[in-house]
Amino acid sequence: MRFQHTCIESLASALPEEILSSTEIERRLSPLYERLRLPEGRLELMTGIKERRVWPEHTRPSDASAAAGKAALAKSAISADQVELFIHSAVSRDMLEPATASFAHRKIGLPATAQIFDVSNACLGFLNSLTIAASMIESGQIKCALIVSGENSRPLVEETINTLNTADLDRNGIKPYFANL
């Protein structure tokens, strides 16, 4: 569908300050690397990822989403009370239910009348959310939407490192865990 009456008013991000390098992950995986005789530098070589940013421990996805949402509103001519639809479009969630959007909605200070929900579809979740919001604007259901994503990879990376260091895995056995790092 081609959208005629929809635009992106602002785009903003909120990045965590802490950097977790591939070198540090490999250092923490040294028992596994030594046991399987894996060469250092393999993680960065295979992924192209030198470093990733991680939120402090116990940071919830709604905290990251709220920070990004506040930053987007600050850069726009739209006030929080004009938002009629709020979507948290991430894989990470505060909990299964209620929607993570409900927590971020409160933290941003959006109106109680705003529709809220989560859209989780891996890397396409944000694009799906844009399409949903634009379709609702085009159809006249709403005038303004705020879409956020707040991922927190720290718990997954930490659990993966722990699993790889404690499980009795061979080179083939570690492959399913690779994308988690």
Give the label of every model feature segment.
Residues 1-84, 106-109, 178:
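Conserved "HGTGT" condensation-loop signature of ketosynthase/thiolase-family condensing enzymes
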Residues 84-91:
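Short glycine-rich or small-residue beta-strand-to-loop segments that form or flank ligand, phosphate
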Residues 2, 34, 74-80, 94-98, ...:
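Acyl-thioester C-C bond-transforming condensing/cleaving domain
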